Structures are given as C-alpha cells and as structure tokens.
C-alpha cells in the first residue's frame, strides 16, 4: 500500500496524495484489462509482488539488442577505431551521466583504488574507459589512467568501444536490465556488477 510518502512535503500523512493516487490507479488498473509488460524478470517479479499489480496480467519481454550489430569483433581493430590503447587492459564504465549517485561511481572509484593498491602493476598495464556525460569530472579521482569518452551516439563507435574492453563494470545501486549489460555481453565482454 502506498501512503505516508516521504517524497511529499512534510513527509506525507496517512491519507495523503500518494494514498489517493494509489487507490485511483488500483481502480483503473483492475477495471481496464491492461496487460503490463516488464523488461526484466526481476522487474516482472517485483511488479507481481507489488500491492498495486498483484493478480493482474503481466509479461516479461526484454529490450531487444541487435546481435548482428552488437557482436564480438577483433579487439585490435576495435581499439584502433576507438583510439583506446592497444597494449593495455581496459575496464569500461558506461552511464548516461557518470556522476549520478545511483550509478555507483563512488563504489567504482573505491574498487579501482583498492585494485591499484593491492596490484600496483595495474597502473602500468590497465586503463579505465569512461563512456557518458561528465566523465571528465571523475578522471582525477581514479587511481588508474583514464580515458573520458563523453557521449557516443554512433552505434559503430559504441560497438568498437565495447569490443575494446576486457571487462565491463556496472556498479549501479538500482537497475532492472540495462541495455549496457546486454550490449556488453552481446559483444563478448564479461560484465561485473552488484546483484
């Protein structure tokens, strides 16, 4: 049941706007025959367990990834196209805006710091590629050499960047089934993230 919403001014009340909206949605949903679609099993299971959608029709249909485009390519060629170093291990981080707290950059920075501390040779043989807005704002906080790539809209460039990476890291605090994981895996790049 949705009530007493902490997002509302003064913390909400027992019969605040969130309660009224919840009750209205429940009435509309149950009387309309809507069939809901979730893009991941986790999101589908969460929706099925919610008090708003319990008992309603719901299917899971993952977002499509074109595996003719997002597929393994020659790493050396991909690195030439992406201008990333040919002779280093590459850890890839991707986010629309890398400074968004929920995307987990603070955890990524800490993890890279620990890796560099325990494996000092990484400073010579490993680099970070950061794809997304505000990437240049975090470079100085990373203990390994970093390449802020900014936004990339060109699909071929994006595929080259994924194929350049040795590992894709997604330390987000909340995601359902992000395309970045699917694209990375389709390119044959292992993904590491929180459960």
Spans of model-derived segments:
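Aromatic "clamp/platform" in nucleotide-sugar-dependent glycosyltransferases that forms part
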Residues: 173
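A short, active-site helix/loop in glycosyltransferases that binds the activated sugar's phosphate group
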Residues: 14-60, 65-69, 75
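Conserved donor-binding/catalytic core segment of Leloir-type glycosyltransferases
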Residues: 85-103, 109-113
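Short hydrophobic beta-strand element within catalytic cores of glycosyltransferases
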Residues: 190-193
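A short alpha->beta transition loop at the rim of the catalytic pocket in nucleotide-sugar-dependent
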Residues: 166, 188
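Short alpha-helical segment that forms part of, or immediately flanks, the ligand-binding pocket
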Residues: 159, 178, 182-186
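Nucleotide-activated donor-binding/catalytic signature segment of Leloir-type glycosyltransferases, i.e.
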Residues: 123-125, 132-159, 167
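Nucleotide-sugar donor-binding and catalytic loop/hinge architecture
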Residues: 74-90
């Amino acid at each position: 049941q949705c009530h007493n919403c902490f997002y509302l001014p003064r913390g909400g009340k027992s019969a605040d706007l969130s309660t009224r909206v919840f009750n209205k949605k429940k009435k509309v949903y149950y009387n309309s025959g809507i069939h809901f679609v979730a893009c991941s099993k986790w999101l589908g299971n969460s929706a099925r367990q919610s008090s708003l959608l319990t008992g309603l029709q719901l299917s899971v249909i993952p977002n499509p990834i074109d595996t003719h485009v997002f597929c393994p390519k020659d790493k050396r060629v991909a690195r030439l196209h992406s201008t990333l170093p040919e002779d280093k291990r590459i850890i890839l981080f991707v986010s629309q805006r890398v400074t968004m707290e929920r995307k987990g950059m603070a955890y990524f920075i800490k993890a890279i710091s620990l890796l560099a501390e325990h494996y000092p040779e990484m400073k010579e043989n490993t680099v970070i590629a950061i794809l997304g807005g505000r990437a240049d704002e975090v470079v100085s906080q990373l203990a390994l050499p970093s390449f802020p790539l900014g936004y990339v809209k060109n699909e071929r460039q994006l595929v080259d960047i994924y194929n350049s990476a040795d590992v894709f890291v997604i330390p987000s605090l909340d995601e359902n089934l992000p395309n970045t994981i699917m694209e990375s895996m389709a390119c044959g790049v292992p993904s590491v993230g929180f459960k």
